[in-house]
């Protein structure tokens, strides 16, 4: 870390401070793992409870899950297309739900009451490592989708309208994960920072509307990440004529 | 790091995001205008318009995000820190 202006100005913000766990030669950010596991556990519990006793007339949790299923299916079907969307729906749905629950969990659960030796608990998606991992997963899966559906004809996509597009399409393969990961990371970190700065300046009332705005944008970011992942996969499996 | 490099990095980081936000801001404005006009003319197409609008917003936003990447590199991983 070269310089950290936030730490100088606001001692509480703690950008770039982490709870390090040493595993072999790797130092990992422990607080991200803790929050991710808690949130994954909550999500799994919800899904298991909701699908335990399924009824013809959905009620309560089952109703919510069926609504989510419909929502994700529509998202995947419009972006990927009728033919292969079924294969990719679980992936898109997992991405959407994990990011959504991470963003909202980071904002809604009062993590501040749990004290850590260093760093603080928060949204797992406010850490660049989480979002880069998710974005690289998306990259791998659209390559896999293209290659498994069209074989080597997938590379026609690179020269599709004209071969002049070739360098741009190759650069795009690198900028796709870059922009996916930084979009999510930047938005979530910015939300947390804005709320933290406002709480620091005016601890009453004023931060509340900003918190609601943060909830709105983080829901939109989860939707955008899932939509773009589906769009990239759809682009890779699309047939050119 | 000497103080002139620090000052230049901080100013450059501010400019990278600030200038990078102008173009996409204008673009998103005109895209939103088009979407609102489309919904006003054809309210039943709202769902489809919203999906396309969000997707195109995301592509425009990525331009600002490249500015953000540059700013974060300057602030937290400065190659000239020495």
From Swiss-Prot, chain B:
Q: Which GO terms describe its molecular function?
A: lipid binding; proton-transporting ATP synthase activity, rotational mechanism
Membrane-spanning residues: 7-27, 57-77
> Where does the protein end up?
Cellular thylakoid membrane
Principal localization reads membrane
User: Topology in the membrane?
Assistant: Multi-pass membrane protein
Keyword annotations of the record: ATP synthesis, CF(0), Hydrogen ion transport, Ion transport, Lipid-binding, Membrane, Thylakoid, Transmembrane, Transmembrane helix, Transport
Instruction: List GO terms (cellular component aspect).
Output: plasma membrane-derived thylakoid membrane; proton-transporting ATP synthase complex; proton-transporting two-sector ATPase complex, proton-transporting domain
Pfam family, any one? ATP-synt_C
Question: Subunit arrangement?
Answer: F-type ATPases have 2 components, F(1) - the catalytic core - and F(0) - the membrane proton channel. F(1) has five subunits: alpha(3), beta(3), gamma(1), delta(1), epsilon(1). F(0) has four main subunits: a(1), b(1), b'(1) and c(10-14). The alpha and beta chains form an alternating ring which encloses part of the gamma chain. F(1) is attached to F(0) by a central stalk formed by the gamma and epsilon chains, while a peripheral stalk is formed by the delta, b and b' chains.
What this chain does, per the entry, is described as: F(1)F(0) ATP synthase produces ATP from ADP in the presence of a proton or sodium gradient. F-type ATPases consist of two structural domains, F(1) containing the extramembraneous catalytic core and F(0) containing the membrane proton channel, linked together by a central stalk and a peripheral stalk. During catalysis, ATP synthesis in the catalytic domain of F(1) is coupled via a rotary mechanism of the central stalk subunits to proton translocation.
- Which family does the entry's similarity section mention? Belongs to the ATPase C chain family.
Q: Would you tell me the protein name for this molecule?
A: ATP synthase subunit c
The source organism is Prochlorococcus marinus (strain MIT 9211)
């Amino acid at each position: 870390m070269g310089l950290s202006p936030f730490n100088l100005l606001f001692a509480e913000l703690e950008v770039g401070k982490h709870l390090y766990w040493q595993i072999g030669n790797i130092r990992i950010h422990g607080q991200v793992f803790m929050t991710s596991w808690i949130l994954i556990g909550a999500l799994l519990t919800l899904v298991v409870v909701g699908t335990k006793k399924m009824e013809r007339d959905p009620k309560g949790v089952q109703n919510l899950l069926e609504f989510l299923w419909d929502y994700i299916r529509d998202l995947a079907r419009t972006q990927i297309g009728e033919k292969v969307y079924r294969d990719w729906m679980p992936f898109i749905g997992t991405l959407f739900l994990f990011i959504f629950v991470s963003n909202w969990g980071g904002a809604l659960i009062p993590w501040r009451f749990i004290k850590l030796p260093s760093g603080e608990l928060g949204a797992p998606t406010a850490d660049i490592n989480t979002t880069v991992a998710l974005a690289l997963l998306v990259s791998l899966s659209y390559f896999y989708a293209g290659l498994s559906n069209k074989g080597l004809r997938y590379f026609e996509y690179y020269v599709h309208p004209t071969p002049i597009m070739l360098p741009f399409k190759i650069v795009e393969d690198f900028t796709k994960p870059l922009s996916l990961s930084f979009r999510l990371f930047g938005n979530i970190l910015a939300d947390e920072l804005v709320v933290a700065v406002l709480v620091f300046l005016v601890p009453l009332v004023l931060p509340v509307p900003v918190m609601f705005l943060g909830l709105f944008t983080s829901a939109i970011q989860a939707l955008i990440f899932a939509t773009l992942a589906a769009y990239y996969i759809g682009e890779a499996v699309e047939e050119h004529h | 790091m000497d103080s002139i490099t620090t000052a230049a990095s901080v100013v450059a980081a501010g400019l990278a995001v600030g200038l990078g936000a102008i173009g996409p801001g204008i673009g998103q404005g005109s895209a939103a205008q088009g979407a609102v006009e489309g919904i006003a003319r054809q309210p039943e197409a709202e769902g489809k318009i919203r999906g396309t609008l969000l997707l195109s917003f995301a592509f425009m936003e990525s331009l600002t995000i490249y500015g953000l990447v540059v700013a974060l590199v300057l602030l937290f991983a400065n190659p000239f820190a020495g």
